[in-house]
């Protein structure tokens, strides 16, 4: 199942910003790049919230998620698309627990295609990476 449009990281500019300034965490199958919401936007939101207290919930940006999978992972597009679908399904399950305003890019390593692991293992690895970067609510 695809991510909601409001949660998709699409623009090249956003991807470059995450790669340039974001945090990096690694696991056996993925690298997670995460860019925190900027504090300048938070302070401007706080001043706007003081003048308009009823609309402060709508001002919080949603978390944007992108998946990067190169042909080094697999030459076959069918395999790459299957892995990408599994990752987006796992991220959709984790979406309600993610802190708002983050920009996340999941980079798939070639080991993901070599090992025949399922979406359940992908979900566990992504949850662990998100907890390490402190993106999950109630991270451990």
From Swiss-Prot:
Cellular component aspect of the GO annotation: ribonuclease P complex
Map out region (Disordered) in residue numbers. Answer: 33-54
* InterPro entries (alphabetical): Ribosomal_Su5_D2-typ_SF, Ribsml_uS5_D2-typ_fold_subgr, RNase_P
Name the SUPFAM superfamilies for this protein.
Answer: Ribosomal protein S5 domain 2-like
Q: Does the keyword Nuclease apply?
A: yes
Q: Name one GO biological process term.
A: tRNA 5'-leader removal
**Key words of the record:** Endonuclease, Hydrolase, Nuclease, RNA-binding, tRNA processing
Q: Please list the reactions this protein catalyses.
A: Endonucleolytic cleavage of RNA, removing 5'-extranucleotides from tRNA precursor
What EC number(s) does this enzyme carry? 3.1.26.5
Name one matching Pfam family. Ribonuclease_P
Superkingdom in the source lineage:
Bacteria
NCBIfam families the record matches = rnpA
Q: Which family does it belong to?
A: Belongs to the RnpA family.
Read off the PANTHER family from this record.
RIBONUCLEASE P PROTEIN COMPONENT (PTHR33992:SF1)
Q: Which HAMAP family match?
A: RNase_P
Q: What does this protein do?
A: RNaseP catalyzes the removal of the 5'-leader sequence from pre-tRNA to produce the mature 5'-terminus. It can also cleave other RNA substrates such as 4.5S RNA. The protein component plays an auxiliary but essential role in vivo by binding to the 5'-leader sequence and broadening the substrate specificity of the ribozyme.
- What is annotated about its quaternary structure and interactions? Consists of a catalytic RNA component (M1 or rnpB) and a protein subunit.
Its recorded name reads: Ribonuclease P protein component
Q: Which organism is it from?
A: Trichormus variabilis (strain ATCC 29413 / PCC 7937) (Anabaena variabilis)
């Amino acid at each position: 199942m695809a991510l909601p449009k409001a949660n998709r990281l699409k623009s090249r500019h956003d991807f470059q910003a995450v790669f340039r300034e974001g945090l990096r965490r690694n696991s056996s199958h993925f690298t997670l790049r995460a860019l925190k919401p900027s504090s300048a936007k938070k302070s401007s939101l706080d001043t706007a919230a003081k003048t308009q207290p009823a609309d402060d919930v709508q001002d919080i940006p949603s978390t944007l998620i992108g998946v990067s999978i190169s042909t080094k992972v697999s030459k076959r597009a069918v395999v790459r698309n299957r892995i990408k679908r599994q990752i987006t399904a796992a991220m959709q399950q984790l979406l309600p627990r993610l802190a708002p305003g983050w920009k996340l890019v999941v980079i798939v390593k070639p080991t993901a295609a070599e090992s025949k692991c399922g979406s359940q293992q992908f979900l566990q690895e992504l949850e662990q990476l998100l907890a390490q970067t402190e993106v999950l609510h109630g991270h451990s």
